[in-house]
């Protein structure tokens, strides 16, 4: 309770600073229409959407046949909702490989209880190989943009994503 008494004026001052700073911008550029919409709602300003690029010379299909596993490529943090992919793959009896690392790794490994293979942080070459071998790439969390679906699709692999956020713009 003491913290809220102290934090309330600090948060009010930060909100004022945020508004004043936002009002000084000449133009807003967002990484997706989803983020541009948030800018419009919060700041009552228009924003252009410019998608981050994907290196389609590097991420491209080859002759690799899919191997029947699902793939998650992600930082292992709570908002990515990796546990949803673990549970869904376990229920569907589809092997799951998880590439990435982060503070939630130990928690997710306990949750998975052997139902997923954790690969850790990998090189871009290793990620590309995994995309090409995966039957499907999963994006279970809400992302402002999400580069993973574009890389996977550039490698010729289907993506199943949460139907919110930037994925609605990029998953075809």
Regions found by a protein language model. Name each.
Residues 29, 62-97:
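Conserved donor-binding/catalytic core segment of Leloir-type glycosyltransferases
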Residues 2-28, 36:
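Membrane-proximal helix-turn-helix segments that form the acceptor-binding/catalytic region
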Residues 126, 140-145, 166:
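Active-site donor-sugar recognition loop in glycosyltransferases
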Residues 31, 72-74, 99-100, 119, ...:
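Short hydrophobic "strand-cap" motifs at the C-terminus of beta-strands
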Residues 151, 164-172:
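Short acidic/histidine- and often glycine-rich active-site loop of Leloir-type glycosyltransferases
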Residues 132-144, 157-158:
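Acidic donor-binding loop of glycosyltransferase active sites
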Residues 37, 41, 54-68:
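Acidic anion/phosphate-binding donor-loop and adjacent secondary structure
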Residues 106-125:
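Nucleotide-activated donor-binding/catalytic signature segment of Leloir-type glycosyltransferases, i.e.
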